[in-house]
Amino acid sequence: MAAAVTVEEVRRAQRAEGPATVLAIGTATPANCVYQADYPDYYFRITKSEHMVELKEKFKRMCDKSQIRKRYMHLTEEILQENPNMCAYMAPSLDARQDIVVVEVPKLGKAAAQKAIKEWGQPRSRITHLVFCTTSGVDMPGADYQLAKMLGLRPNVSRLMMYQQGCFAGGTVLRVAKDLAENNRGARVLAVCSEITAVTFRGPSESHLDSMVGQALFGDGAAAVIVGSDPDEAVERPLFQMVSASQTILPDSEGAIDGHLREVGLTFHLLKDVPGLISKNIERALGDAFTPLGISDWNSIFWVAHPGGPAILDQVEAKVGLDKERMRATRHVLSEYGNMSSACVLFILDEMRKRSAEDGHATTGEGMDWGVLFGFGPGLTVETVVLHSVPITAGAAA
């Protein structure tokens, strides 16, 4: 009789050999594009708030300072005219909002996922795990179930649905995908972030300027990545390796960013010192992540930072003495798409690997080997992912 297999032997066989690797990235936005220069006039007109002249001037200044050129939004003028309660500052409107996002969030996620799967080039039956993240609405079964059905994933795909996480969650999906890939040999994880502002859009209020900050910054977008360990380089092309991933709550930051799902939709509340809280703690986060690697020059690594707003990026740059070039991909995504909550950092990863190839860099990380990805959001929560780039071959740049 053969000896029984030990638990240790089973565990060894279950685990992957190498680190989790990003194998493909796809992004998608709604068709409706909104230019920031035109937005204050449109926003105050559609919300019937044109009599608030001083408030409109404040909002115009917010938009001017946002460093955003354009955003994409599912909400069109027609949809808002049909749903006037969504245009008030506080009016019962959750049903109307839910009716939109429950359909559109998985649909936008599908568009991004299809692009990632196409780039990956493998049959979707090889997808073993699905992680879906959104702060836009809630449903049962969730957006993960809807997406699995839309894509025709196998019925036994292992799903994880993350609702109501907020702007840090692009880092969260990578951290979770990393653990899934490294602890399940042969796993291929489809991780998707899909965000639609229909749940947060509301009219202006003179007594709640923090709500208007969100109206000036937020945009719609979805991004998807395929993550797996031990890539088969005959048919799979690695983009970035994930070396470590961690989450922390910043000290003395309670209430800095809050969101509450109510009859009136999702309301956001921001404290002014959010950029200060993040910049004050950024060096500790970098030190915790990179001291084990012997790295302390923050200009020697590539940067992917959630662009919560320009003030956060400005203060982080100043605090750690970053060259302007380090945040180029991050600022490009802020400019061209706005703050898409959890999806942003995946858009930035996509921009970075594409720009690195176009500019003739030796690696996917702007020619550098090591990099950091930061997510910032409610808590105040910070996600830190240490990345390692891969060499760009002549074929990969094509």
Curated annotation (Swiss-Prot):
Binding site for substrate: T200, G219, D220
Pathway: Secondary metabolite biosynthesis; flavonoid biosynthesis
Sorted UniProt keywords: Acyltransferase, Flavonoid biosynthesis, Transferase
Molecular function via GO: naringenin-chalcone synthase activity
Subunit structure: Homodimer.
Summary of the function given for this chain in its UniProt record: The primary product of this enzyme is 4,2',4',6'-tetrahydroxychalcone (also termed naringenin-chalcone or chalcone) which can under specific conditions spontaneously isomerize into naringenin.
Name of the protein in question: Chalcone synthase 1
Organism field: Oryza sativa subsp. indica (Rice)
